[in-house]
Structure formats: C-alpha cells, structure tokens
C-alpha cells in the first residue's frame, strides 16, 4: 500500500491541492535505525539527514504555495539509549530542526513544548504508560499544544 512507503517516498501520493502539510516523524527512524543518521550535507534518502533534506525540498517543490510544518518527535523513555546506529533520539530532533531552519520551514518542537516526558515517572504513568505512545489523555494534551502552536504559525 502507498502508506507503507517511507515518508520521503509518499510525496508523490499526497493530495496536490493541500493547503497545509504537517509532517510528524523521526521517532520510528530512531527506533528502527534502518538508515544511518548521516550528515547535514547529505541530500539523498539513504541517511536520515539526507532524507529530511530530500523530503523538505520535495514538499517545497510540490507545494510552493502551501504552508509546510514539521513537528519533532516526542520524548520517549528509552531516549538515552543509543539506537542500532549509536545515535540518540535528540540527534534526530536536532536534524529535523536544523534542516527545517535551512529551508525556512516552521517547526513545532514537541520535544520541547509537549509536556510529555515519559522519563518523569508521573508523566509516564498518566500520559504515556508504555514510555513511547501517548494514551488518550496524552493525545488530548498533544492536540491542545499542536492547535495552539499551529495558530502561531
């Protein structure tokens, strides 16, 4: 199915008349570690950094008149454990922010403003019991933060 494709390969399948495109990704890239994290100079989808460039440039080219917004991953309980490529989740967050800044794409930094940090025991218990996926209450918090932040953009 087309939605099984990597994010970078989905651009061709998106609605050509979209007014706003919001991309929320990075945590599965970290967790699965399928591609090396790469360097900022990478421009092909073989690395996470290159895939960010490839995706952002592709969206800008397809949607020059639309608003594009990227969202950083949320914190996760295992964020201080390196992935299979030896990288921490925060490195993926920083790549998204740096690459979006390069393209002048706004970033909704959920890493910094979501209020969901499962490394804090009470937050994990109430909003993110598995340490990764927000529960219904966690999604309510996310929705409120996302709505407030999107209104600022």
Q: Which role fits each region the language model picked out?
A:
Residues 73-153:
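Catalytic His-Asp segment of secreted/periplasmic serine-dependent ester chemistry enzymes
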Residues 56-63:
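Surface-exposed amphipathic alpha-helices with a cationic face
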Residues 1-53:
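Conserved SGNH/GDSL esterase-like catalytic core that processes O-acyl groups on lipids
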Residues 19-25, 29, 67-72, 106-109:
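Structural recognition of the beta-strand scaffold that forms the well-ordered cores
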Residues 38, 58, 129:
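Short, flexible active-site loop motifs that bind/organize anionic cofactors or intermediates
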Residues 16, 64-65:
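Proline-centered flexible-loop/turn and helix-kink motifs
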Residues 12-13, 60, 97:
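Short secondary-structure boundary/capping segments
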Residues 52-56, 93:
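Generic structural signal for well-ordered alpha-helices
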């Amino acid at each position: 199915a087309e939605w099984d494709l990597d994010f970078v390969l989905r651009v061709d399948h998106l609605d050509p008349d979209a007014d706003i495109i919001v991309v929320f990704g990075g945590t599965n890239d970290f967790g699965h570690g399928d591609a090396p994290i790469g360097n900022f100079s990478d421009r092909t989808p073989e690395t996470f950094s290159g895939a960010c460039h490839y995706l952002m440039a592709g969206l800008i080219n397809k949607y020059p008149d639309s608003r594009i917004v990227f969202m950083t991953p949320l914190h996760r309980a295992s964020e201080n454990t390196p992935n299979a490529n030896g990288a921490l989740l925060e490195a993926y967050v920083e790549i998204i922010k740096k690459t979006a800044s390069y393209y002048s794409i706004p970033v909704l930094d959920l890493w910094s403003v979501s209020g969901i940090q499962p490394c804090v025991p009470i937050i994990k218990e109430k909003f993110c019991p598995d340490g990764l996926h927000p529960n219904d209450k966690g999604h309510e918090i996310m929705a409120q933060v996302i709505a407030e932040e999107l209104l600022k953009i």
